[in-house]
Amino acid sequence: MNDAKYGVLLVNLGTPDAPQPDAVKRYLAQFLSDPRVVDVSPWIWKPILHGVILPFRSPKVAKLYQQIWLPDGSPLLVYSRAQQKALAQRFAHIPVELGMCYGNPSLNEGLTRLLAQGVEKLIVLPLYPQYSCSTSGAVFDGISQLFKTMRTIPSLHFVRSYAQHPLYIKALVNSIDESFKQHGKPDRLVLSFHGIPERFIKTGDIYFDECCLTVEKLKQQLDYPAEKVMMTFQSRFGREPWLSPYTDKTMEKLGSEGVEHVQVICPGFSSDCLETLEEINEQNREFFIHGGGKQYEYIPALNDKVEHIDLLEAIIRDICEK
């Protein structure tokens, strides 16, 4: 292994620079303009985005970010930086940088830092365990666009997914077990993944299959009845059908059916963010309690836990040692 020539670019979705409407508007404009995310004709979509969605949605989303913002910034950025720092300490001669698909630090910034250190073999590691065209696919597009401006490009190893990597499953199982020990075993364990339009699956996206792989591996390794494990999908946007069952509707239903205790984990989120800390830990808690439930716990993302860093290190070393 020639350590000096390798470099790692960790990539996550991104975050606004500040929990203020203007910053949120800039971030959402970039995010929702990506055809991988919203694949509607720009002639139709741009007037709706800039004339309706951004003016009305940005102030509302900014208020939500204000509720979860940390002293050092957005939770997603804080935890992603911590992952980068911890991972860099595992390698003596392999630089590790961070880039966001949308917002800052940008993909360009992360790649530029690596190339300035003489990297010739680039490992791009999107922090999305399950592949989707709207996440990992968007990262690939972003890297490809940057390569178009370069006379000499580095060799590329792109990590498409790690939905059933043994260390990933182990880390999730241990997080769930820790929650069980602290709060007791729930009546239901809900595995909530980010949703995507059903249309994406029908046209070839493997995301649903990869979510199922993760769920089946967890069922096999958890000391918990498989029939009490539920897979749901959150964060739907727009009017077309998305992957179901929907997390929010499931919470309402469970509460109304007499289920008293649920615990929720979001296996597809490598870092806690707005969708986990506010949508799952706050909104869906209310749905469950108001529906009649009594006890609700959110199990945090893997964030910068040692077991998560062990996983990322193993993925990288496996590539470098081939």
UniProtKB/Swiss-Prot annotation:
Subcellular location: Cytoplasm
UniProt keyword Iron present: yes
InterPro entries for this protein: Ferrochelatase, Ferrochelatase_AS, Ferrochelatase_C, Ferrochelatase_N
Residues annotated for Fe cation binding in this entry: 194, 275
Protein name: Ferrochelatase
Function: Catalyzes the ferrous insertion into protoporphyrin IX.
UniProt pathway annotation: Porphyrin-containing compound metabolism; protoheme biosynthesis; protoheme from protoporphyrin-IX: step 1/1
Record organism: Proteus mirabilis (strain HI4320)
Any one GO biological process: heme biosynthetic process
Top-level taxon: Bacteria
